[in-house]
Amino acid sequence: HNYFLPQYFCIKFFFITRIMKIIGTGRSHPSLVVTNEMLSQILDTSDEWITSRTGIKERRIISSENLEDLAIDAAKKALADANMDAKDLDYIICANVVNEYVSPAMSCLIQGAIGAKCPCFDLNGACVGFIYSLEIAEAFYKSGKYKNILIVCAEEPSRMVNWHDRTASVLFGDGAA
């Protein structure tokens, strides 16, 4: 009789954690300032009512600028803050909802303007767009395939907000980061 003894293998798993970090930031906002006092002239509200509920004293609204320019400016500032060149980017993610164009995607406009040669896409995530973008960027980074990922969040809610609704209009401003 041949007896086969089970062989036991000791398998060790080693997990190497790749930690992603933010190495640069940039922001860009329109020049037009809309204060709570200005809103109180068209709404049944006051500076005190808005500030006590939101902490907001003013917001920026696009007038002579456009969202694309703000997004590109924020991207350039983030790259400069990170001491990085656009050619070093491995991916661009742009989180936004309100866009000037259906196509091309805002990320493609940013990519072309800064001279990047990497893949890019837009993510429509509304208020949580940055969080979703960060989670996707982390997954890309941990895959080992992408190292330098630019996330740009650009919004122009002033085009859609009901300026006669004091519960919503007091919350939103335009800009990019």
Predicted feature residues:
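Low-complexity, intrinsically disordered or signal/transmembrane-proximal segments
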Residues: 1-3, 7-8
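Conserved "HGTGT" condensation-loop signature of ketosynthase/thiolase-family condensing enzymes
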Residues: 10-90, 114-115
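Conserved beta-strand-centric core segments of catalytic alpha/beta enzyme folds
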Residues: 13-37, 134-177
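Conserved catalytic cysteine-centered active-site region
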Residues: 51-53, 57-68, 96-148
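Short glycine-rich or small-residue beta-strand-to-loop segments that form or flank ligand, phosphate
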Residues: 90-96
